[in-house]
Amino acid sequence: MTHFLSSRVRAIRFAIEGWLYVIRTQQNAWIHTLASICVIAMGFWLQLSKQDWAILILTIAMVWIVEFINTSVEVLTDLASPQRNSLAKVTKDVSAAAVLIAAAASVIIGVLILGPPLLEKIQALISTF
């Protein structure tokens, strides 16, 4: 049992190191971090339903997962092809496109979920003046 727990702790530590690597080396990771924090804070403020929370959490996770995979693809491509190579460029471009699609989808989902209750709150605030 002790070996099982220590190996789980080690695995979690490696995962955190990977996440920190992405945050340190990828400029877009800072955008994802800020967006994640803002969406979560807004979700609490708007008192979202469990269903809306589930969708937002899955959406945030999707963007992070694709960013992690993109970073892995970039690092492996650099390792395999340190010189400029047209196929290496295609590999990186396609991987970056996946992040772009995930991020764009997350914005649309965020607007669909957060938009109506946010407008309601804003209208309520305006009507008090």
Give the residues covered by each predicted segment.
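Hydrophobic alpha-helical transmembrane segments
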Residues: T2-E17, Y21-I65, I69, V99-F129
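Acidic (Asp/Glu-rich) catalytic motifs at the cytosolic membrane interface
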Residues: M62-A98
